[in-house]
């Protein structure tokens, strides 16, 4: 099985909250696609609650588009990580990490402005696979966590696992 890019970085040295360019690739027509690791929690030390991350998934996708789309950038998808420590965001374009961090903070401020659970987009049996598994309160706690700690940039060079370590792990 091929080694995925996300497993070539040392999760024990990752800071959070932080932005990291996880991957950059080009389509056959030459468009740049960038995948960002938006790390909300320190790996193996913190985790987002399932209802909160699910609600955040519904809110974050729209709010990030409001603040980041334009000037050569268009978000394709924002999806939560299975480990519940962050989200992956795929987009067309190559925005600077600081631009992504600013949009992320603005999106978190927007999450805090949502007043009631019924304002969560697509919160119904037709558009959500687990529509009863939501918590606006938990999503807002996550947003406060980000805004209270600010957003840094994680560098791939600083986080790269040495080849010897990968060999020891039989990868």
From Swiss-Prot:
Residue ranges the record marks as coiled coil: none
Which key words are in the record?
Answer: Autoinducer synthesis, Iron, Lyase, Metal-binding, Quorum sensing
Pfam families tied to this protein: LuxS
Q: Name one GO biological process term.
A: quorum sensing
Report the EC number(s), separated by commas if there are several: 4.4.1.21
Which reactions appear under catalytic activity for this entry?
S-(5-deoxy-D-ribos-5-yl)-L-homocysteine = (S)-4,5-dihydroxypentane-2,3-dione + L-homocysteine
Which cofactors go with this protein? Fe cation
What domain of life does the native source organism fall in? Bacteria
Position of the signal peptide: none
Q: Which InterPro entries match?
A: LuxS_sf (IPR037005), Metalloenz_LuxS/M16 (IPR011249), S-ribosylhomocysteinase (IPR003815)
Q: Which GO terms describe its molecular function?
A: iron ion binding; S-ribosylhomocysteine lyase activity
Which residues make up the binding site for Fe cation? 54, 58, 128
- Record's cofactor remark: Binds 1 Fe cation per subunit.
The record's listing under NCBIfam families reads:
PRK02260.1-2 (NF002602)
What the protein does comes down to: Involved in the synthesis of autoinducer 2 (AI-2) which is secreted by bacteria and is used to communicate both the cell density and the metabolic potential of the environment. The regulation of gene expression in response to changes in cell density is called quorum sensing. Catalyzes the transformation of S-ribosylhomocysteine (RHC) to homocysteine (HC) and 4,5-dihydroxy-2,3-pentadione (DPD).
Q: Which family does it belong to?
A: Belongs to the LuxS family.
State how it assembles.
Homodimer.
The protein in question is named S-ribosylhomocysteine lyase
Question: Can you name the source organism?
Answer: Enterobacter sp. (strain 638)
Classification of source organism: Bacteria, Pseudomonadati, Pseudomonadota, Gammaproteobacteria, Enterobacterales
